[in-house]
UniProtKB/Swiss-Prot annotation:
This is Probable malonic semialdehyde reductase RutE. CDD domains: RutE-like. It is an enzyme of class 1 (oxidoreductase). Gene3D superfamilies: NADH Oxidase. Belongs to the nitroreductase family. HadB/RutE subfamily. The keyword NAD applies. May reduce toxic product malonic semialdehyde to 3-hydroxypropionic acid, which is excreted. Its EC number is 1.1.1.298.
Length: 196
């Protein structure tokens, strides 16, 4: 990978991409969701641990189950979005490490320290959420990530009896650009970065 992306590709992924709150009625297919995951799973994670898990909420019945856990400002946009991805992390992600990282006994790194396992899973599932956003943009989809929801309620409703724990939500679909607000400011390099 020695060549920079084209200006149009950078515009799609970063410069012109926006967070959407209003959605067109164009559906997102199951095949598209599979295509998204095929890209997300290739993104790097610590020791290839891949703790992120995705539950794609697509049906009216499933959306109704999610609705009570949403903060009030996130209800309408989530009910309207074709897909809401519950980005979760698997608290037992290390069970797959003999396959995912066969070069060492990486499983033991995490079974010996639950705190390290949880921190690793949460951090890396957050990283994978970023990959999902970029994969959506690359495939022509828009996103609206959210952290305004009751994690305990989501876990009880969707993940009871499993090792999955929710991290954040990402609405996915085709955004209504006419309802976008002006882009908010971003921090300048001097305010957010340092070189030593």
């Amino acid at each position: 990978m020695s060549e920079a992306l084209s200006a149009s590709a950078l515009a799609t992924l970063f410069i012109d991409a926006r967070t959407h709150s209003a959605w067109r009625e164009t559906p997102v297919s199951d095949a598209q969701l599979r295509d998204l995951y095929e890209m997300v799973r290739l993104g790097p994670t610590s020791a290839n641990c891949s703790p992120g898990r995705l539950l794609f909420v697509t049906t009216p019945q499933a959306k109704a189950r999610l609705k009570p856990a949403l903060s009030s400002g996130n209800v309408e946009k989530t009910m309207q979005a074709p897909v809401t991805a519950i980005v979760a992390w698997d608290s037992e992600f290390y069970e797959a490490l003999p396959t995912l990282f066969p070069y060492a006994d990486a499983r033991a790194w995490f079974t010996s320290s639950p705190a390290v396992a949880e921190e690793t899973a949460f951090r890396n599932s957050s990283l994978q959420a970023g990959y999902l956003i970029m994969a959506c943009r690359a495939l022509g989809l828009d996103t609206g990530p959210m952290s305004g929801f009751d994690r305990a309620a989501v876990d009880a409703e969707f993940f009871s009896g499993t090792p999955w724990k929710s991290n954040l939500l990402i609405n996915i679909g085709y955004g209504d650009s006419e309802k976008l607000h002006p882009r908010l400011p971003r921090l300048a390099f001097e305010d957010a970065c340092a070189i030593v």
